[in-house]
């Protein structure tokens, strides 16, 4: 699926978020390559604030820990669920749609919805939230290191 971002089908509307378009896992996995999935999921051009002041109550809760384990198993420990791109080191479970303090305070279903969650590495998680992806890896070719 190599469609321009403007043509991507998104999963719907989040009523609480002023009609913000909702990303979802079932759409993300239709993109076969890691780069396409990363581009679909990037949030660095979407304004949001992280609810760090209350998020620890979520991330230490038994329900979250169970949900987190289920998502890691579903994605087979692979970055963005792309088979073969295994995560070595800490595995982050990313909310595709940013959560709010209110979501945590009322224990909104969006916190635990598998359609709103995906396994990522720390580098990928940071790329989704804070910066464009690093330079793509270029496949080496014979003679590409010649100086003259």
Model-derived regions, located:
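Alpha-helical and His/Cys-centered functional microenvironments
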Residues: 11, 20, 98-99, 129, ...
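Short cysteine-rich loop/turn motifs with clustered Cys
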Residues: 63-97, 121-123
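A boundary/linker detector
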Residues: 1-66, 83-89, 136-148
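A detector for short metal-coordination/catalytic motifs
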Residues: 114-116, 123, 127-148
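Histidine-centered nuclease catalytic patch
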Residues: 83-118, 132-137
């Amino acid at each position: 699926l190599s469609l321009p971002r403007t043509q991507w089908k998104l999963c719907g509307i989040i009523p609480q978020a002023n009609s913000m378009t909702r990303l979802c896992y079932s759409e993300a996995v239709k993109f076969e390559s890691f780069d396409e999935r990363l581009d679909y999921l990037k949030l660095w051009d979407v304004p949001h604030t992280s609810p760090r002041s209350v998020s620890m109550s979520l991330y230490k809760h038994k329900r979250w820990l169970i949900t987190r384990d289920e998502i890691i198993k579903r994605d087979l420990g692979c970055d963005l669920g792309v088979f073969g791109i295994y995560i070595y080191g800490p595995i982050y479970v990313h909310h595709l749609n940013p959560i709010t303090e209110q979501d945590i305070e009322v224990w909104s279903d969006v916190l635990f919805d598998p359609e709103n969650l995906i396994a990522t590495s720390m580098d990928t998680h940071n790329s989704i939230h804070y910066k464009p992806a690093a330079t793509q890896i270029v496949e080496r070719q014979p003679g590409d290191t010649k100086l003259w």
